[in-house]
Curated annotation (Swiss-Prot):
PROSITE patterns: AA_TRNA_LIGASE_II. The gene is lysS. Its main location: cytoplasm. Mg(2+) 1 binds at E400, E407. It is found in: Cytoplasm. Keywords: Aminoacyl-tRNA synthetase, ATP-binding, Cytoplasm, Ligase, Magnesium, Metal-binding, Nucleotide-binding, Protein biosynthesis. This is Lysine--tRNA ligase.
Length: 493
């Protein structure tokens, strides 16, 4: 056992002794309901009205300092923290003894008068205190700077207690999602829920998680996207729908990827990718202004400006700018392979021009996209669910939004031709048979739905986690997910 573990063990022993002493005194250390009428920050903001009045507040003790027959403590709640003042002559010996047994981390209910100390600090003169939860494990003294940052993610409950800025991130995350809902609800969109377990995973290019339903004796997949179900609803006449929910992809973990993540997906009948582009710009800029109060934010040393209109560039033009390749002159698969080789890329056997365009874009362009930028005109080979462009049918009416080198949104004019869709599914199935585990499966029921007739529609997915990262200045996706997926510790492996 390490020295720190020994110290914690000894401290826990002392706290358990205090717990026993409280019970001997007839005090319940794990209290019940407590009616509070004030929060720390509200007391400070309304001090002129509350001075001298008795209030009830509850929260966690974050510090304590005693001087003989008087002492102070800091109490924290969701809104902030406030100083408590304890005096034996006011509380009496028995209740002052309760104060003396306080440990940092204990949760109390407090009744007392609001006043300002001689040093000018707004405080509460405690008249009564109630134990609501005795803390048996001491809080860490130096949590924020831990070298093992994963410990903060593993014990998020402690992270939230000792780091107010972490709490603020998740409060802001909640507000971002609320504002997105409000924006869409106000514009006539209907929030819906679609299956999390699906017999056929679809709607994205990704490796799924597989589970088994015992009663039905069948394999099911945690969804990689809700897209195909949402478009079934468009077929059914629900013309404007959205869903905010989890997706699951059995892939790697990084600062930008977590196996389960939150997406907003939106579909609008009689729209297209340009309608989605405008909606994306309007929605995100409106939420940015509501939540942050400004269209400009600093992120990793860059000042990002969300003021519309955002830059729009075709994928081919973006490649031409970044890599000097003009794919309007490179027409064949062979010439595209040669161009990719010259750039130092490893080219898979049988790679098509469209696949190589996408690969070159990912390798040479994405890292240069800092300010909000719509990249549109993706090859049909990498867009199996998007409508072909009328003028250049080898490309699609699709866009991706990039900010700070990250894909934030993906949208397109939805393919509603069941014959074309089935042909593309067949090509995806061939890729899957060739070893591409991320290629789409055939979904006959979805084809059947399209055969009833789906109106032209625009559809879009926005990555909530990555958007929250930007709006909160968080460098890792694990900073904006309360309980991210983590590698097992050696003792758990």
């Amino acid at each position: 056992m390490s020295e720190s573990e020994l110290n914690i063990s000894e401290l826990k022993k002392v706290r358990l002794e205090k717990l026993a002493e409280l019970k001997e005194m007839g005090i319940e250390p794990f209290g019940r309901r407590f009616e509070r009428d004030s929060m720390a920050q509200n007391i400070k903001e309304a001090f002129s009205e509350l001075e001298g009045k008795t209030i009830a507040i509850a929260g966690r003790i974050m510090s304590k300092r005693r001087h003989g027959k008087a002492g102070f403590a800091n109490l924290a709640d969701l809104s902030g923290s406030i100083q408590l003042y304890f005096r034996q002559d006011d509380l009496g010996p028995e209740k002052y003894e309760l104060y003396k047994k306080l440990d940092i981390g204990d949760i109390l209910g407090i009744q007392g008068e609001v006043f300002r100390t001689q040093k000018g600090e707004i405080s509460i003169h405690v008249r009564d205190l109630y134990y609501l939860s005795k803390s048996l494990t001491p809080l860490p003294e130096k949590w924020h700077g831990l070298k093992d940052v994963e410990l903060r993610y593993r014990q998020r409950y402690v992270d939230l207690i000792v780091n107010p800025e972490v709490k603020e991130v998740f409060v802001k995350r909640s507000r971002i999602i609320k504002e997105m809902r409000n924006y869409l609800d106000d514009r006539g969109f209907l929030e819906v829920e679609t299956p999390m377990m699906q017999p056929i995973p679809g709607g994205a290019t990704a490796r799924p998680f597989i589970t088994h339903h015992n009663a039905l004796d069948m394999e099911l997949y945690l969804r990689i996207a809700p897209e195909l179900y949402l478009k079934r609803l468009i077929v059914g006449g629900l013309e404007k729908v959205y869903e905010i929910n989890r997706n699951f992809r059995n892939e790697g973990i990084s600062t930008r990827h977590n196996p389960e993540f939150t997406m907003l997906e939106i579909y609008q009948a009689y729209g297209d990718y340009e309608v989605m582009m405008q909606l994306c710009e309007d929605l995100i800029s409106a939420v940015m202004l509501k939540v942050n109060g400004s269209m400009q934010i600093d992120f990793e040393g860059e000042q990002l400006d969300f003021t519309p209109p955002w830059r729009r560039v075709t994928m081919l033009d973006a490649i031409k700018e970044a890599a000097g390749l003009d794919f309007s002159l490179i027409k064949s698969d062979e010439d595209a392979c040669q161009a990719a080789w010259q750039l130092g890329l490893e080219v898979k056997a049988g790679a098509s021009r469209g696949e190589l365009i996408n690969e070159i874009f990912e390798q040479f362009v994405e890292d240069k996209l800092i300010q909000p930028t719509f990249v549109y005109g993706h090859p049909v080979e990498v867009s199996p669910l998007a409508k072909r462009n009328l003028e250049t049918p080898e490309f699609t009416d699709r866009f991706e939004l990039f900010i700070m080198q990250r894909e934030i949104a993906n949208a397109f004019s939805e393919l509603n031709d069941p014959i074309d869709q089935k042909e593309r599914f067949i090509k995806q199935v061939e890729k899957r048979a060739g070893g591409d585990a991320e290629a789409h499966m055939m979904d006959e029921d979805y084809i059947n739905a399209l055969e009833y007739g789906m109106p032209p529609a625009g559809g879009m997915g926005i990555g909530i986690d990555r958007l929250v990262m930007l709006m909160t200045g968080s460098p890792s996706i694990r900073d904006v997910i309360l309980f991210p997926t983590l590698r097992p510790r050696s003792s758990e492996a």
